[in-house]
Amino acid sequence: MGDGGKIVKDVVLLYDNCCIYEIVILNYFLKATGSDVVFCSIKEGKIVVMEGYSIHTESALKDIDLSQVRSFIIPGGDISNIDYDIVYNSLKILHSSGTLIAGICAGANILEKAGLLKGIHSSRQEEYDCVRDRNIITARANAYVDFAIETAKALDLFEDEEDLQETIAFWKEFKRAL
């Protein structure tokens, strides 16, 4: 529950030929911390991701109550499959309400096309692999671990600094868990 008993959801926009590997670690962090993750698509139902997996999304984007969204996540891939006004309009509404919006690889292109990257630092205009500026996180495909960690930090998913450092050591530095 968020402030005032408001239900909050972390929404992941999936689509045919999206790159699921770019968001697998982030989804793990969300689920492991009890977050209410909703997989949506333009039309509810089965999508086939770039890696060949079939995923059944539980909601169409048009059915998402944007006032209950804590974060909105867009992986990269063939973004022509989400090049629709409903996506851009939803992003603008979420952005204006301060919702965390995260796009990796071509997902960041969608944020740019929606006009959300004007006047902020992003992986689209900078030489950085992963950038957080206010309520927007963007990353290049190779930065999927940094993307997951930065988004998790923005959502306050880590118990404390030690939890964060253990996560970095395990996922980014490939050190064994103690």
PLM regions with names:
Residues 1-7:
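Short, Lys/Arg-enriched N-terminal segments with co-localized hydrophobic residues
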Residues 9-18, 24, 28-45, 53-178:
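Active-site-adjacent pocket-lining segments in enzyme domains
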